[in-house]
């Protein structure tokens, strides 16, 4: 990962485009220029909150999401050189949050509705996080020993440490 100095230097490369194509390339439409602007201003808590408004698993996505084929490939800087390394910036903020205390995103008042989700892989975890934010009570059912699905059982430790998955799941 980046040091703080490297992260700010990389974030400073972002052109803050009026019509950011990087956001269009992101499957969950993370407001990329917005979180990068927070990073430049050293507002790390705000930056991770921006990411979490759309992405429940930033530490995972910052490590294994194929940014070079999605958001980064659409960065205009890539036309003349290297695009902004969005994934490493997302990872930096997620790791910063882990080291400084997790923030629980705001959630709506309880609705009284209870939702069961079968499968605690990435899709199930994301659905659970979105439903909890909307005020619903969620119960996850998982056939295997640990939640995380492919994140735990399909991605090798050197690529995605299990501790990272555990932290994301437990928040």
Give the positions of each predicted feature:
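Ferredoxin-type iron-sulfur electron-transfer modules and their immediate structural context
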Residues: 1-114, 162
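Beta1-alpha1 glycine-rich phosphate/pyrophosphate-binding loop at the start
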Residues: 29-41, 49-52, 79, 83-87, ...
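Conserved beta-strand elements of the Class I
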Residues: 116-118
